[in-house]
Amino acid sequence: MKEQVLESPFCKKEFLELVDIVSEAKTTKLANYAISDSSIVNIGDRDFVDYRPDISIDPQVLKDNNISSISFDSLHFFQVQNLVEEIDTKSVKIKKSDVAVNLILPKTYEEYLESLTKKNRHELRRKKRKFDNETTSYELGESKEQDIFDIFISQHRESKGEKGEFMTEVVETYFRNLLNLQGWKIYYTNTDKGVLSTAFCYENDDGCYLYNSSRNNEFNSINPGIVLNDLIIQQLIERDMAFFDFLKGTER
């Protein structure tokens, strides 16, 4: 898991530079962290960053900047351990706030189905049948093109509540710039009824990180998001990928 965290897009310099446009301004930025007033904090707001790079803090930095507190989020436990061992502190408070769901991929899709509980396997098959019955044809697509990106954005904005409010013009620009970076792509369900769901992902040689998603809410009853994830899993297994990381969030 350590390698999966540190090889994620969230630890790369180009991502940390880009995520600044949707994050609160920090006073001073150093190597993989920032200083805000008298506190050391992460670079990039937690709503946009699922994993963090390794962080090493020189004790002299604490002294020179009169640091009174260190406040980090989205750290894996191995990173928490390293920081506790490295820094001399009066007290440490660890709070579990998010869960990242990670699927280790088997060698075959049949093995994946067998790994599900009987109930979940039945539910997946039922939902796929319903999708089959409501669509004449469908396939998994992947793209970095503007037309698919526009669908991803519009489906977000047509959503109710926080999901719809999330996609501001600034956030749209952020996602567009992300898509231009190497490794980022949009998976989508290409059907006779149009694009019913999308998944904004990052891929490397080992696996896939599901960063964000959208769907056409008119078709919620046939579960286009679940079908898309299932299609992605099938393709990743066929390509001998090691994992499908759903990252953190309430929709997993």
Predicted regions located by residue number:
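A conserved beta-strand-loop-helix scaffold within acyl/acetyltransferase catalytic domains
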Residues: 1-41, 75-221
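Conserved acetyl-CoA-binding loop-helix of GNAT-fold acetyltransferases
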Residues: 55-61, 220-234
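Conserved GNAT acetyl-CoA-binding A-motif
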Residues: 67-76, 236-248
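Cytosolic ligand/metal-binding cores
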Residues: 252
